[in-house]
A protein has these predicted regions:
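Glycine-rich phosphate/adenylate-binding loop
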Residues: 2, 109-117, 121-228
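Aromatic pocket-lining residues of Rossmann-like dinucleotide-binding sites
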Residues: 43
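Conserved N-terminal Rossmann-fold NAD(P)-binding element of oxidoreductases
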Residues: 29-31, 54
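N-terminal charged helix/coil linker that caps or initiates catalytic domains
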Residues: 1-28, 167
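Hydrophobic/small residue at the entry helix of a nucleotide-binding pocket
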Residues: 35-36
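Glycine-rich phosphate-binding loop and adjoining beta1-alpha1-beta2 segment
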Residues: 48, 53-91
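A structured beta-alpha segment of the ubiquitous adenosine-cofactor-binding alpha/beta core
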Residues: 78-117, 122-128
Length: 228
């Protein structure tokens, strides 16, 4: 099996057969902001064959500090437009299905249908719970990630799990990032960890974070895995 030159630095971390299998996988990314941009870029560089993603926002100046698809020239343009452009420049061989659409209860199941895994890059607890419910109904595994300030968290959710309810309980609305901000390093770090977990699942390896949550504190550089 001949691995393309562009993927050879993946080999050793994963096998040639695992690299080949990634070409057949389809990943749904919910959101193209701070987390979602990094997630999609890493999936494209890793060689995942099919990336489906949604977002309904345009780039604003406040995105420039942390969102990898945002540039001064992209301000006012749709995040989906810039995502397509950058991902095709990175890897023209992959299939992209990127839509300017909002995730809601009414469309959630249709959006994720046919995907092998879902990666959460949302900033709304309500929308995360909608996504998790749809994933459960469609029997699709999901990687959860969230960020705020110096802090982040990552967890892996199988269809039979009730992880987000355990994490958030009855909380609603936006996450804490609206009040304490987001520097560039937390989305990059949490996105990397989400993609690592997603890739493990896609190639048939065991997840490290099912029924657990990785709590990240970059201020104190403290990383703790907690059972949930």
């Amino acid at each position: 099996m001949e691995v393309k030159e562009r993927y050879k630095k993946n080999i050793g971390t994963i096998t040639e057969a695992e690299q080949e299998s990634l070409k057949t996988k389809k990943v749904f990314v919910a959101g193209l902001g701070g987390l979602g941009g990094y997630i999609c870029e890493m999936l494209a560089r890793m060689g995942v064959g099919h990336i489906k993603a949604i977002d309904c926002d345009v780039f604003e100046e406040s995105n420039l500090n942390r969102q990898i698809f945002s540039t001064e020239k992209s301000l006012g343009r749709a995040k989906t437009e810039m995502a397509k452009k950058r991902l095709k420049e990175i890897n023209s061989s992959i299939s992209l299905d990127i839509k300017n659409e909002r995730l809601e209860e009414i469309n959630s199941r249709e959006l994720i249908n046919g995907c092998d895994i879902i990666i959460d890059a949302l900033d709304s607890i309500d929308t995360r719970l909608i996504l998790a419910s749809a994933a459960k109904d469609m029997n699709i595994k999901m990687v959860h990630g969230a960020i705020c300030g110096w802090y982040g968290q990552v967890s892996v959710i199988f269809p039979e799990d009730n992880t987000l309810k355990r994490i958030y309980g009855d909380k609603k609305g936006k996450g804490q990032e609206k009040s304490i901000g987001n520097p560039p390093f937390t989305p990059a770090l949490v996105a990397s960890l989400e993609v690592a977990e997603a890739v493990k699942i896609l190639i048939g390896r065991e997840s490290s974070l099912r029924n657990k949550i990785l709590l990240i504190d970059t201020l104190l550089q403290d990383y703790e895995v907690v059972d949930i």
